C-alpha cells in the first residue's frame, strides 16, 4: 500500500514538477529551433523530461495487452513484472481518471502552439508522440475487448495480444532511447503526424 500511495503521489505531481523544472531551466537554456545539432546541445535535463510522458502509453499497453501475456513469460521476467510493474499497473487501472488528466495536461501545457510556457522542441515532440501512442493503444485495446471472450483467450487471440503488446513496448523503448540521445524518433505514420502538429520541427 505504501508503494502504491508513493507512486500515486509521484504520478500526480510529475507534470507539475516537470513544468517547474522547465520554467527554471528556460532561464539558462537557449532554445534553438534549428535542431540539426540537437545531439550535442540538448541538455540532459531536457532529454530526461522528454521521456516522462511515455509512462502513459506504457501503462495503457500493459492494461490492454500486457497483463494477459506477461504472466506466461519465462520465470525470470515474472518477479520484475509482479514486484515493479504490477503494483503500478493496479494503481493506474483503479484510477482511470489519471490517464485522462495526464492526456489533457500534456496537450494543453506542453504540446499546444499556444502553450502557457515555452517548451523545448524535443519535449513537445515526445509529449505529442506519447499522446498518439496512448490513443493507438486505447483504440486497439477497445477493439480487442470487443471480441468474444472465447477468441481473446484462444491461441490466436493471445498471439494478437502478444503482438500488440510488443509493438507498443518496442515503439516506446525506441522513442525513449532516441530522446535520451537527444534525437527525434521516426515511427511510420505516428512520427509524421507529430511533425504536422509540432511546428518548427527539423530533422
Curated annotation (Swiss-Prot):
Q: Which InterPro entries match?
A: Tic20 (IPR005691)
Q: Name one GO cellular component term.
A: chloroplast membrane
Q: Where in the cell is it found?
A: Plastid, Chloroplast membrane
Residue ranges of the TM segments:
2-22, 51-71, 84-104, 131-151, 153-173
Write down the Pfam families for this protein, in alphabetical order: TIC20 (PF16166)
- Lineage top rank: taxon: Eukaryota
Topological relation to the membrane, as annotated: Multi-pass membrane protein
Q: Which UniProt keyword terms apply here?
A: Chloroplast, Membrane, Plastid, Transmembrane, Transmembrane helix
**What family name appears in the similarity comment?**
Belongs to the Tic20 family.
Protein name as it appears in the record:
Tic20 family protein Ycf60
Natural source organism: Porphyra purpurea
**Top-level taxonomy:** Eukaryota, Rhodophyta, Bangiophyceae, Bangiales, Bangiaceae
Task: Identify the coding gene.
Answer: ycf60
